[in-house]
Amino acid sequence: MPRYPFRRFGFGALRRLLYLWVRSETINQSAFTLKIDRSKPVLYVLQQPSVSDLAVVDTECRKAGLPRPVMPVAVGDAIEPAAFFYLTPEPDWLGRQDKRGASPTLVRMLAAVGQNGLDDAQIIPVSVFWGQSPDSESSPWKLLFADNWAVTGRLRKLARILILGRKTRVQFSAPIHLRELVEQGKGHERTLRMVNRILRVHFRNLKTAVIGPDLSHRRNLVKGLLRAPLVRQAISEECESERISQEKAEGIALRYANEIASDFSYPVIRFLEVILSWFWNKLYEGVKVNHIERVQDVAQGNEIVYVPCHRSHIDYLLLSYLLFRNGLTPPHIAAGINLNMPVIGSILRRGGAFFMRRSFKGNQLYTAVFNEYLHTLFSRGFSTEYFVEGGRSRTGRMLHPRTGMLAITLRSFLRDSRRPIVFVPVYIGYERVLEGRTYLGELRGATKKKESIFDLFKVVGALKQRFGQVWVNFGEPIHLDQFLDRHQPDWQDQDLGPEYRPDWLPQTTNLLAKDVARHLNDAAAINPVNLVALALLSTSRQALDESALARILDLYLALLRKVPYSPSATLPDGDGQALIEYVKSMNLLAEQKDALGRILYLDEQNAVLATYYRNNVLHVFALPALIASFFQSNSRISREQLLRFARALYPYLQAELFIRWSLDELDAVIDQWLAALVEQDLLRQENDTFIRPAPSSRQYVLLILLARSVTQTLQRFYMAIALLLNAGQNALTAEELENLCTVMAQRLSILHGLNAPEFFDKSLFRHFIQTLLDLRVLRKDEAGKLSYHELLGELAEGAAKRVLPAEIRLSIRQVALERPAEEAAAESNDAAAN
C-alpha cells in the first residue's frame, strides 16, 4: 500500500507502467464538478482493494487538480498517511478478509469528527469501470471480460486491464459530509454502521446504473442451501451411511451446490446477445416469434417455467436471447452436466445455465441439494427453463416426456403454493437444424456421440449453407394450480407428508407431462420444409412432378386453413409453388428435367433427413391422414363405420404423437375434416356415406398421398398385434415383443426398400406396448407374460383391413408367421444334435 514514501515511490512506478497502456477519463466530467471544501479533509473511498483502480483514481485526481489519494492528509492534529480507504477492508498477511469489519481509516475519521472536535471531513466515493457499459459495448470479446458483480481474481483483473484498459472510466460521486451524519446523535457505533450502509447502497446503485443489475443469486444462495431443513437431514443421513464427519458431508453438499448453481452475469448476457444477433443473421435468416404476448400477460405475479421442445443445442440460448430482446428476464436453464465443458460451461453458467446430472439415483444428498436449489428458484420468483424431453429429439418427433423435473416442480409447489407456477410451452421449429448431419448418422444407426467443445468448430463449416429461418411459437400457458384443481380437487387440504410425496404424485406428474407435450405440439410452426418433406416422403420414390407437388402443397395449406390444428399453430405465407421455390433455394431438393416437365426428388441423404422435418408436423396431419386411409382399400364407407374404427385407432396415434383432441371431441373434429375433404373434392358425400374419387383422377392421387403420411405408423401397430396374436396368450414378455417388433420391422424395411430407420425405432414399439397396457388391452401375469382380450384379433383385423392395403397386411402376416416356423426348425435341429 502506498502509505509510506518508499511505497509511494513504487506506486508511482507502477502507475507510470500502467499508463503505458491504460487510457482513462471521468464519467460526465465528474472530477471537475465536485463541490468540495479544500479547507477540510478530503478522503476517497473505493469499494474493493485494488492497486490498479487506485492508480487510475490518482491519475484522474492529478488531471482534475484534486487532492491526491496517495498523499498524506491532515485530520485535526493527526496525519493520515494516505487520503483513501477501501469499503471492504484489505486482507491480512494470511490473505484473510473480514468483510463485515469497518476500515480503520473511516473509524479514525468518524472519531475525529464526533469526539475530537474536527469541524468536518469529506468522503468521496469513487468507482472505476474497465471498458464501456455493457449496453454500449458491441465487441463480444470485450463483453466477456467486462466489469460484473463477481469478485475478480488477479488473473482476470490483468486480462481485463489488457483488453479493456484503453476505455477506463472513473465516476467521482458527491462528497458525504461526516459532520451531517454525526449530528444525528446516534452514537459512534451506530453512525459507523450507517456510513458503511450508505456507502454499500451507493456503490451498488451506481454499479447497477453503469453495468446493469446484479442478476446472480449464487453468492448468497449456495451457502443458504446447506441451511435448509431437508438438506440438513440429507447431510446427517450421509454422515451415518458413509461414516464420515459432519464437516466432510457439508463439504460434499457445498461442492454439489457449486456444481449445480448458475451465476447470472449481465455483461455475459449482453455478450451472448451480441454473439447470437450475429449468429442468427449470419447462419439463419432471422427468428420469427409468435404469441410472445402470452408470456407478457403471465409474467407479473407468477413463477414462469419455460418448457421448450428440444431440437438443437442452440435451443439453450435461443429462448434467453428472445426474452432478453423483448424486455423479459432471461430464465435459469437446466443443462446436462455434459455441457459443463471448459470455457463453454463457464459462459453458459453466467448466461443462466444450472447444471444437472443425468441420473440422481442412489445419491440422496445430491438429490436433496438439487431439489432445494430448484425450490429456491421457484419460491424467489426466478423464471426457469427445462426440456421435458430430456435430450434432443433425433427423429424430429416429440419425445415421450421425462417426468423428473416436472415431479420436482410439482413437489416444490405443494411445499409452497403462495407464488403460482405457470408452465409456458415454447415450440422451436428449424427449417434446417444445425446438427442435421449428426442426426443423419444417428438416424442411420450410428452411435450417439458425447458432446465436446470441439463440436463448436463444426459450426464454422456450416456457415456456407443456407439454413432458412427459425420459428418460435409460445404455446397456451398451463397454470399449475388450475391443473391440480382438475385432477386433485382437494390437494390444498391434504396431508402431503414431510417430503411432499403424496400417493397420487406419479400419476398426476404423468398427466402433467402429457399435457405439456400436447401444448407444445399445439404450438407447432409449420414451415415450407416440413410440408415438402411430408409430401415427397408419401411417394414410393420420394419424387413428384413439380406441378403435382405444388398441388398437394396447396391442398395441405387449404386444409389447415379450413381446419386449423390449434390457435397456437402457425402456417407459412405463400402458395405451393412459392414453398417449392423456397425449399429449392436451400438446396434440399434435386431436380431432373425431361420433355414433360420437371421432376423434383430427394436424394438418398436428404430423404433420410427429410423424415426429421416431416416428423416435426406429423401430429398435425395424423387425423386427416387416418381418415384418408379408410379409402385406400375401400371405395366407400359410412360415417358410422369410419367413426367406430377411428375411435379404435385414435388412442394409439394420440399417445405416440401427442395429438390435442380427447376421445370425447373426436367425432366433432372428424366431421370437420370430412367436410374439408369434401370441399376439396377428395371425397363425395351421399347421405351418410362418403365415397372416394375415381382411381384415375387427380383427386384420388392427392387423397392417397395424404393417407400415406401415417401408413408406416399404422403398419407398426399392426405388426405388434400380429406378432402378439401369433405367439398366443402368456407367451411373450413386453421386452420380447419389443425386440421381435424391431427385428420384423427391419426385415420389412429391407423387403420393401424403406429408407426410413425410424420405422424400426425400438422406443416407438415400447411406447405402443405401454399404451396397450395403459388402456388395459394387454395385461401382465406374475411372470411378466402378456395376455390380451379375446376380441383383439377381430378388432385389429377389422381396423387394419380398412386402413392398410391388402399387400401390406399380407406381407406383415407372412413375416410374423415365419417366426414360429423358424423356432420349430431350431428346436428340431437341437433335438437332432442331442
UniProtKB/Swiss-Prot annotation:
Its EC number is 2.3.1.15. Its main location: membrane. A motif (HXXXXD motif) lies at residues 310-315. It comes from the Bacteria. InterPro entries: GPAT/DHAPAT, GPAT/DHAPAT_C, GPAT/DHAPAT_LPLAT, GPAT_PlsB, Plipid/glycerol_acylTrfase. Pathway: Phospholipid metabolism; CDP-diacylglycerol biosynthesis; CDP-diacylglycerol from sn-glycerol 3-phosphate: step 1/3. It is found in: Cell inner membrane. One of its GO terms (biological process) is CDP-diacylglycerol biosynthetic process. Keywords: Acyltransferase, Cell inner membrane, Cell membrane, Lipid biosynthesis, Lipid metabolism, Membrane, Phospholipid biosynthesis, Phospholipid metabolism, Transferase. Transmembrane segments: none annotated. It is a peripheral membrane protein. GO terms for molecular function: glycerol-3-phosphate O-acyltransferase activity. It catalyses: sn-glycerol 3-phosphate + an acyl-CoA = a 1-acyl-sn-glycero-3-phosphate + CoA. One of its GO terms (cellular component) is plasma membrane. The HXXXXD motif is essential for acyltransferase activity and may constitute the binding site for the phosphate moiety of the glycerol-3-phosphate. HAMAP family: Glyc3P_acyltrans. PANTHER family: DIHYDROXYACETONE PHOSPHATE ACYLTRANSFERASE, GLYCEROL-3-PHOSPHATE ACYLTRANSFERASE. Belongs to the GPAT/DAPAT family. This is Glycerol-3-phosphate acyltransferase. It comes from Pseudomonas aeruginosa (strain ATCC 15692 / DSM 22644 / CIP 104116 / JCM 14847 / LMG 12228 / 1C / PRS 101 / PAO1).
